[in-house]
Amino acid sequence: MAGQTDPHISLFSPQEVEFMAEDELVEIVPNMNMEQLNFISGDFGRFIPQIPTKVPLWLAVALKRRGKCTFRPPGWMSVDNLTQILEAERESQSTFQALPFSYVEIARLLFDHARDDIPDMYMVRSLVEDIRDVRLHKLETNLGSFQGTSAVKISNVSAMEVNIVRPFVIRALEAFYKHDKPEADVDRDTRSSRQQRETNNEPRRPLRQR
Amino acid sequence: MASNSEAGGSADYETLMSTSDVELLKRAWRNEKAAPEILQYEGALVDRAKEQIELVEETIEDYVENGIDPLVVSLYQMDLDRAQFLLRSYLRIEKFMFHNLNSEEAERRLSEQEKVFATRCADDLAKHFEETVLLKLPENYQSVLKQSLISEVDDMVPQPHLDTFVVCRSKNFVSLNLYEEGESPETVEMERGDLYFIRYKIVKRAIESGQIDLI
């Protein structure tokens, strides 16, 4: 957490990423009556049997574990939608499909605690895992093709994925930037070929550690 | 206790009114963690959060005494735990950050207590270094702050690494100046919700004003 050895590259631990995801709102169907809850983080409720209501993920899991509600799986988690997304991810080498920012964490928590609330659970689960694999693989291959710039835009990457690639990308971009600045006068071609070589050196190390 | 209505992204005023303190604390914690230097210490926010936490702690004790449904009590306790976790992590980050920093700018941002802590810490560190190592080095190299008497600046003090890259997302459409000083000004435009890996220096102002979040 706060005790990091390398202060230059801050990392969130997976638990912290999950913590942040737990504030996402999900829909549940309570099976009991309960008054409104006035939390520090907000007001939720009231809870009426069979009336769906939106609560943060952590609260939903807590209620579910005590048998007080069932989950309504989010729209994006249907077999059809996920199959479509998987197809689209496989087709394009460079763009990522739009998925909720915390889809990994949400999916994992739902699988762990709410299996019976998800239709075709096994199918959904394997789809999500496939999507994760394809996206991670895409991220890895794309990382080798940066041109050195000051800003890189990546759309639709999720929280967990960002966290995984963050240290490497930061180091790579820093290296580009450092080498870019004093060479502003050098011929463009020489610079881009040098960047190519740079790309070849940097990716190997951190990825192989896995 | 603030209510957490759906921030539909319309008027900024509404978003401000409906963001709970916990949300703000979470944002401050996230930004602080991802940034390469200490950000402005959110004293008022921390105090408000502390107050609310204490209030809830008392309420929970009351609930337990009055025999309210233990389920409800445990849920309030969970919410409390989450808020406490955020607060503690945030304070811990502040303390850790200035183990490495001792620049003037950092001092401006720290709270009073932290300044006291920092000076004490720095003094202890200096003494420790002196006794163990520096006295054994040749005379020119004996300062904690300078690499040698020849250096003009305090170059033994690690400067915050402002040129590093961070991941960020903007809340609204934002247009930023990419290059500084004499180079051709280029701008990068960030739509709402886009993710960027970008140099910290460029987005620093925007983060302080709350337009951009670090991730």
UniProtKB/Swiss-Prot annotation, chain A:
The keyword Nucleus applies. InterPro entries: GINS_A (IPR021151), GINS_bundle-like_dom_sf (IPR036224), GINS_Psf2 (IPR007257), PSF2_N (IPR056784). GO terms for biological process: DNA replication. It is found in: Nucleus. It holds the Pfam family Sld5. PANTHER family: DNA REPLICATION COMPLEX GINS PROTEIN PSF2. Component of the GINS complex which is a heterotetramer of GINS1, GINS2, GINS3 and GINS4. This is DNA replication complex GINS protein PSF2. The gene is GINS2.
